[in-house]
C-alpha cells in the first residue's frame, strides 16, 4: 500500500483501498503524502462551493462547507484539538497532562475550544471579501494545515516514547520538509494557472 493511500485513509473518510492494517514503517513514511491529501480535501470543498454558491447565501453556505470538512476528515483534527485543549488548560503537571490528552473522554476545555474554533472558521470564511478568492482559500486551508503537520512532526520532539506520533516522528523521511515545502508552494500556482486557462477559454 503506497504512502498516499495510507495518508488518504488516515486523514479522511475516503477509502480507495480497503485496508486497516499497516506496518509501522509504511505508516511513518505516509507523512510525505499529507499535503497531497490536503489538496484533495481542498478541491472537494472548492467544488462543493462552486456547485452550491449560486443557490445558497454565503453564511449558511460556509457553515455547510465547515461541516462538510468535518465529515470528510472524520473529525480527526477536532479530536486532536479537544484532547490538546483538555491537557494544556488542565493546570496539571506534565505527565498528568499527557494522560488527559490520551483519555478518550472530552472535557469542558475541549468542548469550548471546538465550538470556538468552529465558529471562528465559519465566520472567517464568510468574511472573505471577494467571492473569487473563496475557492482558492478553501484549497489552501487544508493544504497548508497538512503541510504544517509534516513540519511539526519533523521539527519538534514527540512527547511520548511510543504511540502513533512516534511512528511519524521516527520514520518520516528526512527530506520530507524540503520536498513538501516545494510541492506545497507549487501546487496552488499550478492550480491557479489551470484556473486562469479554463476561465479564458
Task: Locate predicted features.
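Hydrophobic "anchor" residues on beta-strands that sit immediately upstream
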Residues: 79
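Hydrophobic alpha-helical transmembrane segments
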Residues: 1-74, 92, 98, 103, ...
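Catalytic P-loop NTPase motifs of RecA-like helicase/translocase cores
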Residues: 88-90
